Amino acid sequence: MPTEYTNLVSALADTGYPCAEYGWKTRPDGTYLVVGLDYEAGRQEGDGAKQDRSFSVSVDAFFAKLSDRAAVAGKVEAALASCLGDSWELNSIQHETETGLFHIEWVGEVFGTITAPPEPEGDA
C-alpha cells in the first residue's frame, strides 16, 4: 500500500473514533469512520503486471448529532492535511434517512505503486 495511505489510516485511528478500512460488518454505536483506497487488484497489463501511480482514497464519517460535526470534521481534516497535504477535498455532507446518521465524505489522492501479483503459471 502507498505510504501516504497507511499513514492516513493510522492518523484516523488516532482521532479517537473507531475506524475501519472498507466498512464495518456490524456498525459501531456513536461516531465512526470508514476509509478506503480504490484500485484494480489483480489486473494484468503489458509485461504481465500493472503498476498504478496514483489512487483515489475516500474517508467517510458517520455521527448521530449534528452538533458533533465540527469536532469530527476538524479531526478528520487534520489527519487528511497531515498525510495528504492539499490532495483532498470535502465531497459531501448528508443526512441518511435509513440510519438516521449524518455522513460526511472526503476524497483525495495518494501516490505510490501497487503491483498486481503475476498470474500463476501452468495448470492449476
Task: Name each model feature, range by range.
Residues 51-65, 100-113:
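Oligomerization/assembly interface segments of phage tail-like spikes and tubes
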Residues 74-124:
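Acidic-leaning, charged glycine-interspersed low-complexity segments
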Residues 1-46, 67, 72-75, 98:
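Small/polar-rich, solvent-exposed N-terminal microdomains that initiate assembly or binding
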